[in-house]
Each structure stands twice: as structure tokens, then as C-alpha cells.
């Protein structure tokens, strides 16, 4: 059998960590049923990613597969088409080590009900949970992209916006969910938890304002 182009130990550790993280995400209600996908970089050319159609509340190590940076399988399993949105981030920045994508109630309602092309979070203490933010007197603008089945085209739009400096920690897809990334999986989960909490707060504030 030919040697794999990535460490099996690194893959096994990544699969274990992604499965455990996925169960935490599911328990918070951010990834119902088979929605969402999660990944972790294995090396320069490969990443571990959740397989398509897996129930996130029952996620196991065997539900994780390897793909190359073009989103093509490097182990058994079927990757989600959205894998290209993960690999775009890994190709864009070699420091990115983990990507988490969720389908929460708050992100869906906010992006479906309000037609703006971005959501701004400002003045929240919890913003300091995000990598590189040290003051609550900060403003985070999260771009909202239109949902599409043409994932390659969407990945190209995201890449263009990132190269223009318009995306820092996360982006949203209308009616679809949130993407965030970081230099390791625990930090990525921390950012996800902060962002999902802030989006839920923002939704409630807008309801109270009647806006």
C-alpha cells in the first residue's frame, strides 16, 4: 500500500478532535441534523473534513475524511461540496489551521430577515474572545454572501473579499450560516461560541427595537 501524503497519527488526532468539537457544537443547537461542516489542516496540502450528510449530534471519528486543497478526496468518504470553502481559506492563509461552519437559528434569521450585505457587531465585551481583538471598543463587520449552489464561484468571491482586506474573522451566507477560522481548533471553537452568542444577542436586540 502506498504511503499516505499526510501523517496517519495527525489525521487520527484531527478526526478525534473534530468529532468531539462537532458534538459540542450540536449540543449548543448551532448545527441541527446533518447541516454544517468542520475541518482541520493536516499539512500544507491536505485537511481533515467532515463527510457529507453525517448527523452532527452523532459525529464520530469515522465520519471524518481527508481531502486535498482542491477539495478532492484523499481517503474514503464523500466530502460536502462546501469543502471548497474550507480549502479556499487554507490556501489563502497558511496560518489557518481550523475552519468551522454552522447553521444556527440566529445566523439564519438575521441574514434572511435583514437584506444588508453585512452585519456589524460593536461595543460588545465578548468581541475580545476573537483572535487579535483586545478591546470591547471594537467593531467587527461580518460580510453576508448570497447563498448559491455554485460553491466554486462563492469561494472565488470570498477569496476576492479576503484579498481586499474586507474579511477578518468570519463571514455569513444568507439563510445558510456562519464560517469562522483560526490558528488552532480550540481557538476556532472559542470564536464560534462568541460569534454565535453575539449573533443571538444582536437578533434579540433588533427584535426589541422593532427594526
Curated annotation (Swiss-Prot):
SMART domains attached to this UniProt entry: Aldolase_II
Highest taxon above the source species: Bacteria
GO molecular function, one term: methylthioribulose 1-phosphate dehydratase activity
PANTHER family: METHYLTHIORIBULOSE-1-PHOSPHATE DEHYDRATASE
Full protein name: Methylthioribulose-1-phosphate dehydratase
Keyword Chaperone assigned: no
Organism: Alcanivorax borkumensis (strain ATCC 700651 / DSM 11573 / NCIMB 13689 / SK2)
Pfam families in alphabetical order: Aldolase_II (PF00596)
UniProt KW keywords: Amino-acid biosynthesis, Lyase, Metal-binding, Methionine biosynthesis, Zinc
Keyword Metal-binding: yes
Xref: InterPro entries: Aldolase_II/adducin_N (IPR001303), Aldolase_II/adducin_N_sf (IPR036409), MethylthioRu-1-P_deHdtase_MtnB (IPR017714)
GO cellular-component term (any): cytoplasm
Positions contributing to Zn(2+) binding: 101, 103
EC number per UniProt: 4.2.1.109
Record function comment: Catalyzes the dehydration of methylthioribulose-1-phosphate (MTRu-1-P) into 2,3-diketo-5-methylthiopentyl-1-phosphate (DK-MTP-1-P).
Amino acid at each position: 500500500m502506498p504511503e499516505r501524503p499526510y501523517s496517519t497519527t495527525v489525521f487520527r488526532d484531527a478526526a478525534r478532535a473534530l468529532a468531539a468539537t462537532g458534538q459540542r457544537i450540536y449540543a449548543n443547537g448551532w448545527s441541527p441534523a446533518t447541516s454544517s461542516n468542520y475541518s482541520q489542516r493536516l499539512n500544507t496540502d491536505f485537511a481533515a473534513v467532515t463527510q457529507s450528510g453525517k448527523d452532527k449530534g452523532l459525529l464520530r471519528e469515522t465520519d471524518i475524511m481527508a481531502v486535498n486543497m482542491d477539495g478532492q478526496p484523499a481517503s474514503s468518504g464523500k466530502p460536502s461540496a462546501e469543502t471548497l470553502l474550507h480549502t479556499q481559506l487554507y490556501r489563502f492563509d497558511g496560518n489557518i489551521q481550523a475552519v468551522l461552519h454552522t447553521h444556527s437559528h440566529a445566523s439564519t434569521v438575521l441574514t434572511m430577515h435583514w437584506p444588508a450585505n453585512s452585519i456589524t457587531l460593536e461595543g460588545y465585551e465578548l468581541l475580545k474572545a476573537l483572535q487579535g481583538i483586545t478591546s470591547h471598543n471594537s467593531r467587527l463587520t461580518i460580510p453576508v454572501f448570497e447563498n448559491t449552489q455554485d460553491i466554486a464561484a462563492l469561494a472565488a468571491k470570498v477569496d476576492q473579499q479576503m484579498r481586499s482586506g474586507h474579511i477578518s474573522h468570519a463571514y455569513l451566507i444568507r439563510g445558510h450560516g456562519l464560517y469562522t477560522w483560526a490558528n488552532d481548533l480550540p481557538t476556532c471553537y472559542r470564536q464560534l461560541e462568541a460569534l454565535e452568542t453575539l449573533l443571538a444577542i444582536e437578533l434579540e436586540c433588533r427584535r426589541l427595537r422593532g427594526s
